[in-house]
């Protein structure tokens, strides 16, 4: 499983998210923690724009969930199997099953609300 890491400079926090491939997807979503997966592509401007908020969420919620990213260009079979038609799409998994999803969240607050509402279900 690969990791994307950003260097810490001048008080900035290190942000880490898991880069998910086909071999690791099934294993990851069956973890005991909740798993939040961002389906995205590098050519998607909106995906890149919301990426910083997603990285902050992955750090702030690391005690309750694992955050990962699936590049649909590199892993189209995962996107197809999960019926991802629009990007960015965030999917929350529990015990190997998708429990909720959100398409094109507009802000970090929207992602937080999505997670909190899903946790209440």
PLM feature spans:
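Structural micro-motif
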Residues: 76, 82-91
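Short pre-active-site segment immediately N-terminal to redox-active cysteine/selenocysteine motifs
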Residues: 33, 40-43, 86
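Conserved redox-active cysteine motifs that mediate thiol-disulfide chemistry
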Residues: 39-53
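ABC family nucleotide-binding domain
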Residues: 38, 51, 62, 81-84
């Amino acid at each position: 499983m690969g990791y994307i890491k950003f260097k810490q400079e001048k008080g900035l926090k290190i942000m880490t998210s898991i880069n998910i491939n086909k071999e690791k997807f099934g294993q990851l979503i069956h973890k005991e923690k909740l798993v939040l997966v961002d389906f995205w592509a590098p050519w998607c401007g909106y995906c890149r724009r919301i990426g910083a908020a997603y990285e902050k969420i992955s750090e702030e919620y690391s005690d309750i969930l694992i955050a990962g990213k699936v590049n649909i260009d590199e892993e189209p079979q995962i996107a197809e199997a999960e019926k991802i038609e629009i990007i960015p799409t965030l999917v929350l998994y529990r015990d190997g099953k998708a429990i909720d999803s959100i398409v094109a969240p507009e802000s970090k607050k929207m992602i937080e609300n999505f997670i909190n509402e899903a946790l209440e279900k």
